[in-house]
């Protein structure tokens, strides 16, 4: 049995949540070790613990938070393009920290203008010994990497508008890179039409275990003429 002494919030629900997480991982057909699973649950525990002071999420119930935050982010893993990743508007680290735990070889930068949320991420990844994440407290317009430091993949689940996401993300994208936005419904046709002259757009339907809501990953690749 797992030693749950390091858990502050979910210790009395650990076995139930671990079983749920393992079943979700099996359904998603992703390869995650027992140690990575423990780190995902520790991240969830820290999210709920820090939430009392830092207002990181409106979701306070551990099972609901596991499904709507952790498992929701895990569902994109089979579809993520390879390479260095930037997560814009990461909030408490979603999906960036979740991806980092599961893909320790991938360099990931998580960016948010909210200092408290970045402070939470810094503390959490230090305690979890997640070494492939660089947290940045900045507005996106003030984050301008040099050409050689741009990103192969830019993700976000924070933008309601796909055009706003593209406007923010495209200048930080390396040549040949991919934009991948976590969405509920497929973006409206008029929004897609604005972008289709410059971007190849695909909408991937996601099946998120235990989440009875529509989810899509909208990916965009620059059209080279």
From Swiss-Prot:
Annotated InterPro entries: rRNA_ssu_MeTfrase_G, SAM-dependent_MTases_sf
Catalysed reactions, semicolon-separated: guanosine(527) in 16S rRNA + S-adenosyl-L-methionine = N(7)-methylguanosine(527) in 16S rRNA + S-adenosyl-L-homocysteine
Listed SUPFAM superfamilies: S-adenosyl-L-methionine-dependent methyltransferases (SSF53335)
Subcellular location: Cytoplasm
Keyword Cytoplasm: yes
Molecular-function GO terms, alphabetical: rRNA (guanine-N7-)-methyltransferase activity
Binding site for S-adenosyl-L-methionine: 89, 94, 140-141, 157
Cellular component GO terms held in the UniProt record: cytosol
Classification via HAMAP family: 16SrRNA_methyltr_G (MF_00074)
Family listed: Belongs to the methyltransferase superfamily. RNA methyltransferase RsmG family.
Function in brief: Specifically methylates the N7 position of guanine in position 527 of 16S rRNA.
Stated name of the protein: Ribosomal RNA small subunit methyltransferase G
Source species of the chain: Psychrobacter sp. (strain PRwf-1)
Recorded name of the encoding gene: rsmG
């Amino acid at each position: 049995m797992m030693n749950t002494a390091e858990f502050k919030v979910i210790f009395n629900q650990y076995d139930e949540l671990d079983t749920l997480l393992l079943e979700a991982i099996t359904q998603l057909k992703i390869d995650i070790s027992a140690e990575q699973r423990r780190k995902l649950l520790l991240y969830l525990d820290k999210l709920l613990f820090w939430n009392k002071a830092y207002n990181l999420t409106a979701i306070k119930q551990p099972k609901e938070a596991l499904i709507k935050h952790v498992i929701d982010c895990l569902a994109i893993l089979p579809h993520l393009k390879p390479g260095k990743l930037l997560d814009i508007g990461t909030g408490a680290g979603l999906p960036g920290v979740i991806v980092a735990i599961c893909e320790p070889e991938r360099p990931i930068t998580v960016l948010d203008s909210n200092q408290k949320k970045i402070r939470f991420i810094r503390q959490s990844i230090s305690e979890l010994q997640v070494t492939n994440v660089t947290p940045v407290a900045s507005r996106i317009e003030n984050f301008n990497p040099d050409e050689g430091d741009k990103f192969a993949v830019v993700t976000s689940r924070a933008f309601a508008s796909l055009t706003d996401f593209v406007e923010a993300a495209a200048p930080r994208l390396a040549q040949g890179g991919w934009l991948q936005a976590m969405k509920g419904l497929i973006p409206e046709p008029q929004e897609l039409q604005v972008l289709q002259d410059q971007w190849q757009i695909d909408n991937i339907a996601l099946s998120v275990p235990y989440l009875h809501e529509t989810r899509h990953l909208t990916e965009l690749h620059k059209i080279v003429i």
